[in-house]
């Protein structure tokens, strides 16, 4: 149930854990903390509490900043977190509390499972039942060297590849406000990235009606905006030996693991070729100033949500032996799932055939669903 005063576990699946953070319980003062770790991990936390003001009011706030490159290749993180709490004792019978918490973040992902031999051939060959031929010089997998600028080995991540910094096409992602920005790093591009911000806001009211009757009411809003990225369309890809899937070769004929070729994709999408080839497929496209058709793009799979609710509970102590509790739990929610264009990868538009309402395809631009 999040930050609420309700102590009922149902209908929360698995029950409820509720951590009470009372601003009035903290003395005046603050602190600053820094943490460091492997993979360029750096986290800074600053906190300040006002303590009790005029014997009836208190505020508390915490801000966190976290960055890192990641131990596995290009699994970087870029995140903030915040907490704000306020408490006001209006009189002996009425107390109000306001809480807000959230953590906007982005991070590079490592989603695709690889054969053990792609990480450590020697260890794979030592595993009982593993076919050592798979990691021989002519075998199916490589755990050393590189292809297309992506190194193989234990920290290999198939979800990224280098890209020329001369490509300055913007990316679109929405996280409480439209954002059309440069990619995370000018020298590489993540195929899979997660970005999300889910703020929670609670307004709590505690009313003492009498010595044996108490009413608590919580108004809350739970948001959510973000998603995850991936490819859409045809993406030039090379095998572990650097052989590109083109007019007479499919990349998965060769050894693994496989590597995306973003620079070839940008060249295809921004070039003047009537037909380009990806994995032996001929892809016809239009081209010209402001009219370059992309054959492959990056997409966002978005999740946007809003939940509003009221939780109210009345406690009535009839006697030491009998205590009654009445309450309501009401909420309404709206959730949107869709795909949108994240990066046109050098082109001006993409023709999407996923919508049955457009038999000849629908032209979509940056940020379009």
Where are these regions (language model features)?
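Short loop/turn motifs that connect adjacent beta-strands in outer-membrane beta-barrel proteins
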Residues: 8, 24-29, 53-56, 92-93, ...
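Outer-membrane beta-barrel pore domains and translocons
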Residues: 2, 20, 33-39, 62-66, ...
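N-terminal periplasmic accessory domains that precede
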Residues: 9-33, 44-50
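Transmembrane beta-barrel wall of Gram-negative outer-membrane proteins
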Residues: 29, 36-67, 72-110, 117-163, ...
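Outer-membrane beta-barrel proteins
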Residues: 35-43, 66-91, 105-111, 121-122, 173-206, ...
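Surface-exposed loop/interface segments of Gram-negative outer-membrane beta-barrel transport/assembly proteins
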Residues: 104-184, 263-293, 355-369
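Face-selective signature of the C-terminal outer-membrane beta-barrel domain
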Residues: 197-227, 233, 238-369
């Amino acid at each position: 149930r999040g930050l609420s005063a309700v102590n009922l576990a149902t209908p929360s699946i698995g029950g409820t854990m509720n951590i009470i953070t009372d601003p009035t319980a903290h003395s005046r003062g603050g602190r600053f903390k820094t943490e460091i770790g492997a993979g360029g991990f750096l986290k800074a936390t600053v906190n300040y509490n006002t303590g009790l003001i005029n014997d009836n009011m208190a505020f508390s706030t915490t801000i966190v900043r976290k960055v890192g490159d990641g131990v596995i290749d290009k699994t970087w993180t870029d995140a903030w977190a915040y907490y704000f709490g306020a408490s006001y004792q209006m009189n002996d019978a009425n107390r109000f509390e306001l809480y807000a918490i959230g953590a906007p973040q982005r991070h590079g992902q490592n989603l695709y499972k690889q054969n053990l031999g792609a990480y450590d051939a020697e260890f794979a060959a030592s595993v009982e039942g593993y076919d050592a031929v798979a990691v021989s010089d002519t075998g199916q997998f490589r755990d050393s060297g590189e292809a297309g600028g992506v190194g193989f080995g234990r920290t290999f991540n198939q979800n990224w590849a280098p890209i020329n910094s001369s490509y300055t096409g913007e990316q679109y992602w929405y996280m409480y406000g439209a954002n059309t920005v440069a990619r995370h790093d000018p020298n590489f591009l993540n195929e899979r990235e997660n970005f999300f911000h889910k703020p929670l806001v609670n307004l709590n009211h505690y009313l003492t009606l009498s010595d044996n009757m108490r009413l608590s009411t919580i108004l809350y809003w739970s948001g959510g905006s973000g998603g995850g990225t991936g490819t859409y369309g045809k993406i030039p890809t090379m095998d572990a030996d650097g052989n590109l899937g083109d007019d007479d070769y499919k990349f998965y004929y060769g050894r693994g693991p496989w590597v995306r070729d973003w620079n070839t994709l940008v060249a295809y999408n921004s070039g003047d070729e009537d037909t380009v080839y990806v994995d032996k497929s001929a892809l016809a496209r239009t081209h010209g100033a402001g009219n370059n058709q992309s054959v492959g793009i990056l997409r966002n799979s978005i999740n946007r949500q809003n939940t509003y609710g009221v939780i109210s509970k009345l406690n009535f102590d009839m006697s030491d032996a009998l205590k009654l509790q009445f309450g309501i739990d009401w909420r309404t929610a709206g959730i949107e799932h869709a795909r949108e264009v994240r990066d046109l990868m050098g082109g001006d538009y993409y023709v999407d055939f996923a919508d049955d309402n457009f038999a000849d395809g629908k032209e979509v631009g940056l940020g379009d669903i």
